[in-house]
Regions:
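Face-selective signature of the C-terminal outer-membrane beta-barrel domain
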Residues: 301-458, 481-493, 530-531, 535-541, ...
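Short acidic/polar hinge/loop motifs at secondary-structure boundaries
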Residues: 128-156, 175-177, 272
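Conserved C-terminal beta-signal and adjacent last beta-strands/turns
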Residues: 255-257, 433, 492, 588, ...
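Membrane-embedded beta-barrel scaffold of Gram-negative outer-membrane proteins
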Residues: 313, 319-325, 483, 489-495, ...
Length: 745
């Protein structure tokens, strides 16, 4: 269980859930000391490369596989690390929309083809990173995740089979840092707007004479944030110990992340933001007729991943891979609430009035993962088969840690709810690539997935949320790839994906007395690619046809997660265009554009004009929520002199809607952002160099707002009697900057 320290009527999460400076210094000392070992030149680099590739071979695909992909190597990831959060590192990739509450330094979100993050499968070396219950990746729980990556591949559509909830629009496959040939080190310091400070320190030994390699990265980020009363303190640690044998690789890896961040998801009304664009209502309460703000309105979380990988080359054709992971997480939201006693089950004290309460909603969970895979690479046939097993257990519980009512005696902390979740998830798959000849090959990927999910206990609003379900899904994918010439190819793939509801979807459905259904997707992709020394072009047509798709209804819970609803029939149909041109060594231009049609079919909802007392039922083909029909990005890169680089980066996101009704009152205006980046590198001899960077975001100082939540409500006030539309916004920052100095050795 989470340990607590009690102080002055409040309690704090045990300080062990932070990465201490002593721990950081110890890691640095170990990293420095291991440089004293002699390096090895005995390991054949081809063997090292093959062993590293075995770890990710079942989640990565080559350009012979008929899937729609974008891959970023280490150099490209370093280039994108001027963005603090991984979603913003990826925002120039096709069909990607990144958003955040504080300019990308706090809570951030990622959507691909309009699909939200809980439907994007994210994995690290083939082990799923998505939380098994929420199916989300909370990026700020592990800051600088991109700095831990050797490469990253985005698979759009249903993607290749892997563990965890399958891709329902995209998958992100991350490969962690590989061992290097020689020792290395890097110190990265940055400072930017809103007193933002970021820092990271990395080092590695290279492969030593005994086959061992040690690598680590420590990162931190603090910021006051753009929005008032926000602030964040984030830390992460990546450590890896690898042993390379003649045909075997054993790797121990740990990733630790912690964060404390102010809550901003409540959003604010137009008139509030017009008066103060940084206004944040979270934590507001009234005392003696004055409005005050609770200073510790925070989201706090600590996450630890411990992983073991064993890869072995049985022969020139056969390889085996085993991976094991243990993940532990614990954390809490602390909030000031103004509610009645009955909201916390304290009906014996109910007096009809609202009172100030400080509450904590806590989470404590563990996940255990085992992946086993075998692969055969023949002259004409590539075959792989494997099994992914995951077990998850978690607890959700909430306590009142302080309240203001001298007439009532209540021992604090007072726990008012607790519930549990257990989930078994097993995936078995077989994949094959067969070459009919030098130009034509076929791809098949068959996945069988079984889930047993049980939730029991009482929810935060006190209803019994007992739920047990078994799901059995068959997810096949079939495709053809045709090589037109040495630099051209075309492909077609059809795939089916099925997935279970999230815990929050189940909880909300139980509370409403509804039935929540699993989702199904039929994905069709037809693509063309051309690449030459100076330019490249690709076009991809896609049709994603859904049954019972879960989409945001525009509202959010008290804990900040999006509330969802089943849409019986819906589709996302579009074309993705991507091109790059380098007419000279000193200039390159890259761009991508997605044009799409994202609709719910025969969607039924109720509508009204503000002040109406009667609702009208409407059935129509409406836009899916948060799914813009136009998304584009462009990068112009200039190299005016050797070791200097200037980039202009543009991002356009078209009009979208906050819910699934397509009503103009809930529309989000389109926006265009222009960022600029300049860098220069000084070479100091050997591998020593210093790079200075300056990034200016939103150069045009465009003022825009993104959605926090929307909802219809009924007012029984005599002067405002009737139905009304309601919405809140998250103001996005104007022009801001980040400067960095990087020393590599």
């Amino acid at each position: 269980m989470v340990k607590h320290i009690y102080s002055c009527g409040r309690y704090l999460l045990h300080q062990a859930t932070r990465i201490s400076r002593r721990q950081m210094i110890a890691c640095l000392a170990v990293a420095i000391s291991i440089f004293n070992f002699q390096l090895s030149t005995l390991k054949a680099q081809d063997t090292v490369r093959k062993l590293d590739e075995v770890i990710i071979q079942d989640v990565r695909v080559s350009n012979k596989t008929p899937l729609t992909t974008s891959t970023m190597n280490r150099e490209q990831l370093d280039e994108a690390r001027t963005a603090v959060s991984l979603p913003f590192m990826l925002e120039t990739q096709p069909s990607v929309v990144a958003s955040g509450e504080n300019g990308g330094v706090g809570a951030t979100a990622l959507r691909i083809r309009g699909v939200d993050g809980s439907r994007i499968n994210v994995n690290i070396n083939g082990i799923t990173l998505n939380d098994p219950e929420s199916q989300e990746v909370f990026w700020y729980n592990i800051p600088n995740l991109g700095g831990m990556a050797q490469s990253m591949q985005i698979q759009r559509g249903v993607g290749a089979s892997n563990g965890g909830s399958p891709a329902f629009g995209a998958a992100i496959n991350m490969q962690t840092l590989n061992a290097q040939n020689h020792p290395y080190g890097e110190a990265d310091l940055g400072f930017g707007s809103w007193n933002t400070r970021q820092y990271s320190f990395s080092a590695g030994t290279g492969i030593l004479k005994n086959g061992l390699s040690f690598d680590f990265t420590y990162s931190g980020l603090t910021s006051d944030g753009y929005i008032r009363s926000w602030g964040t303190d984030q830390q992460s640690f990546f450590g890896s110990v690898s042993w390379y044998g003649e045909r075997t690789l054993i790797k121990l890896l740990t990733i630790i992340g912690s964060q404390t961040t102010g809550i901003t998801w409540d959003g604010a009304y137009d008139y509030e933001l017009d008066a103060d664009p940084t206004y944040n209502p979270s934590g507001a309460y009234t005392m003696d007729g004055k409005t005050l703000y609770y200073p510790n309105e925070t989201d706090n979380y600590w996450q630890r991943h411990y992983q073991l990988y064993v890869s072995h080359l049985l022969s020139d054709n056969w390889s085996l891979n085993a991976a094991f992971d243990f993940t532990h997480g614990d954390g809490y939201y602390e909030q000031m609430k103004n509610k009645k006693y009955k909201a916390y089950g304290l009906t014996q004290y109910e007096d009809g009035s609202k009172h100030n309460f400080v509450t904590r909603k806590e989470l404590y969970n563990n996940a255990y993962t085992a992946n086993l895979a075998a692969r055969y690479n023949g002259e004409n046939l590539g075959l792989s088969f494997g099994d992914n097993f995951l077990y998850y257990d978690g607890e959700h519980f909430g306590s009142i840690i302080w309240f203001r009512d001298t007439a009532v005696h209540l021992d604090t902390p007072y726990e008012w709810y607790r519930n549990y979740g257990d989930k078994y998830d097993n995936t078995t798959y077989v994949k094959a690539n067969y070459d009919f000849n030098d130009n034509l090959n076929a791809y098949a990927d068959l996945q069988l997935r079984f889930i047993n999910y049980k939730v029991y206990g009482y929810a935060d609003d006190l209803f019994d949320m007992h739920f047990t379900a078994n799901y059995l899904f068959f997810n096949p994918k079939l495709g053809l790839n045709y090589r037109i010439s040495d630099n051209q190819r075309t492909y077609f793939v059809a795939g089916i994906s099925n997935r279970e509801p999230r815990r929050s979807d189940i909880k909300d459905a139980i509370g409403r007395g509804d039935t929540i259904l699993p989702e199904s997707l039929l994905d069709l992709e037809l693509g063309y690619q051309f690449a030459s020394a100076r330019w490249n072009f690709s076009a991809n047509l896609y049709a994603m046809l859904y049954r019972n798709q879960m989409t945001p209804n525009g509202d959010v819970s008290s804990s900040g997660y999006a509330l969802m609803e089943n849409v019986e029939k819906s589709h996302r149909i579009g074309i993705e265009l991507q091109a790059g041109y380098q007419p000279a060594d000193w200039f390159r231009f890259d761009a991508n554009l997605t044009l799409s049609h994202n609709k719910s079919v025969d969607f039924t909802y109720t509508d009204f004009a503000d002040g109406d007392t009667v609702l009208q039922t409407v059935t129509a083909n409406t836009d899916l929520s948060l799914s813009p029909s136009i998304v584009g990005a462009a990068i112009a890169t200039f190299i005016p002199v050797k070791d200097a680089k200037i980039q202009l980066i543009g991002k356009y996101v078209g009009k979208q809607y906050a819910d699934n009704t397509g009503r103009e009152c809930y529309a989000i205006d389109p926006y265009f952002l222009l960022n600029a980046k300049a860098s220069y590198t000084w070479h100091l001899g050997g591998t020593n160099e210093i790079e200075a960077q300056l990034v200016v975001n939103n150069v045009l100082d465009h003022q825009y707002r993104l959605n926090a939540w929307v909802g219809d409500y009924f007012s029984d006030d005599a002067s405002w009697y009737g139905y009304y539309h309601d919405r809140a916004w998250l103001q996005q920052p104007g022009i801001n900057f980040m400067g960095r100095v990087i020393y590599r050795f």
